[in-house]
Amino acid sequence: MPNTLTNVKDIKVAQSALQPFSSTLLPIRAFSTNFSPEPADRLDTVRVPIVGAPAPSVDFAGSYTTNVDSTVTVAPVQLNRHKFKTIHVTARENAETSLNVLETLLQSAVKQLAQDVLTDIFTEITAANFGAPAIPALAATAFNYKSVLGVREACAVANMPVGNRALIIDSAYFTNLLGDDIVAKSFVTPVSQSGVVDGIIRRLAGFDVYETNVIPGNAEKLVGFAAHPSAIAVAMRYLEPIAEYEEAGAITDPTTGLTFGYMRYTHTDSNRIFITVECLYGFKVAIPNGLKRLVKP
């Protein structure tokens, strides 16, 4: 279900913000997820299925239960993260502005909320959690197709499953990759045409490729990573408000389940309309061999 709001105007405003929220969080598809508009409280636990590399086959020896695959596990993820953004306009501003000022403000707020959530999740990608980088540290100007092949080789050495791999890289590294001769002159239309026209690389060397500009700037010197969904488990739910609001509900992407909460209320003394958007979520490392980091010098 797309949302749980009832007011037509609120539905229109909230739905306009769903696309920037979902598109900003697109790189989160690289991980194992359990997203839903189901209500939950902070510190509740959500079970996220994790599928790693399958166990080898064995010769039949009289029983089919001796080689039961145990690589499908469930990671308990605590919903211990809660971020929000609040916008407001005066009743006069809302009535006299030619464009829908609430929609414009909310789209910007929700995009920032999504960026902050994504940055927070990326803080889990550390040397302590995932070990040495895939390839030696390099600057953005040195990142090219051969670098991607080096990352691919590191994933193979780590026995990362070949399917469902993703490569998430900082915008500067992504831009340099767009200018690589092999990428730019590729005869594979989904790579070359989208790269030139839209600045998009959908698939490369077996990876789904995502550009991001929200990688945390800290001592880890992280600029990207290659990941299988088994690396990190992420959960997201709707935090149902306790107080009374003029309108409140969950806004959900029906395809991915990505959800943010929406609350509208009015401050009568100042004659201002407030809208708060929030995200209740949690994450944890699942299988360390499911991710290989990229770092800068």
Q: What are these language model-derived features?
A:
Residues 1-79, 295:
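N-terminal "assembly arms/tails" that initiate or stabilize quaternary assembly
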Residues 4-9, 17-19, 39-42, 108-143, ...:
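Signature of extracytoplasmic/envelope-associated structural regions
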Residues 42-47, 155-256:
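Extended oligomerization regions of viral-like shell subunits
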Residues 48, 167, 273-277:
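Hydrophobic alpha-helical segments involved in membrane association or supramolecular assembly
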Residues 56-59, 97, 176-179, 186, ...:
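Short helix/loop capping segments that flank catalytic or ligand/cofactor-binding pockets
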Residues 73-96:
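Short acidic, glycine/tyrosine-flanked loop/strand segments centered on an H-E-D-like triad
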Residues 93-162, 171-176, 293-297:
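Alpha-helical scaffold segments that mediate packing/assembly in large oligomeric complexes
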Residues 259-297:
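Extended, compositionally biased alpha-helical segments that mediate assembly or anchoring
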